[in-house]
Amino acid sequence: MVYKCHDTFMVRTPAFPLSVARNVLATEKSEVWNYIKKIGIDEYMLEAIFVSSPSLYDAILKIGKDNKKDQATFVSLYKYLLRASSRTTPIGLMATVGLGHFSLDEESYIEKKNNLDKKIMISYSWIYKLVKELQQDQNVLDRISVVWNKNTYMTSSRIINPYFANHGVSEQNEHKNVSIKSTKLTQFIKDNTENSIKYSELIFSICGIYKGVCREKIVSTINALIEKEFLFTELRIPAYCDSPIEYILSILRKNNINTNLQYNLKKILHEIKVYEEKNGGVQSLKKRKIRWKKSVVTNCT
């Protein structure tokens, strides 16, 4: 197969030109905030720092009240500005990208534009936490579908999940093996979930075969398989998902689950859209952050 390189490519860029870094290096740390205001990037810096370091944002607002604390604030600002103008950074509004073009010129350069399109991406750690809490709600489970994790494998007496990620919410970001004892019940569940099936239908099928087993034990077994990721629910975010919230909303709508949560998630999407379209500044972002928290952050289900 023959591949041809496209003339246009995407490149990560510093938020500010290299000339800013040179000027910062020649500036006393105690004067860095005055320099930021002088070149007219104070509003942008405030917004970017509000996203990446709320504590530093609060400290900037208090400049002039405590000289000792001011000096620590200036040092932090100095480091932020130096990094943002000398190398790419992976966080918040400092994580800028641009489009480049191949040319015959030997010298490369970055053309700075006056406009900046801002895009917001919801933290996946919050998304995973929301999904996990939904999957711990029996009323939700009773309405959604499950499917067997194809990455698992059998040994003589156990079923192994070689990649347990704790639904993406592990603080240590650790992945480990987990295993369960292979029984007739777990084998029946595995055989009947090779393709997606409603949780409630799976319960019904098991109860029809294992009439002497109480329903609570069957539910407990299935829920344990979900917890250990031997079973995936349809709430699991697929790879390369453009909008996790839209995906979760589609599952909630399809199965008529938690209309209050649906409403709040729609509000978040609307606030994000308005902020991006209006290219709002720090005050706009602060107002929306407060409304997001009131919507679902404090109580996602």
Q: Predicted segments — roles?
A:
Residues M1-M121, S220-T301:
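Type-3 copper protein
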Residues K68, F74-S182:
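Extended, well-ordered protein cores
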Residues F164-S179, L185, A224, L231, ...:
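Extracellular/oxidizing-compartment recognition motifs
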Residues E174, C207-V219:
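Short, positively charged loop/turn segments that connect secondary-structure elements
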Residues N177, K181, L185-D191, F204, ...:
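Catalytic cores of nucleotide-enabled group-transfer and carboxylate-activating enzymes in metabolic
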Residues K184, K198-F204, E216, S220, ...:
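Elongated alpha-helical scaffolds
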Residues K190-E201, K211-V213:
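Short capping segments at the starts of secondary-structure elements
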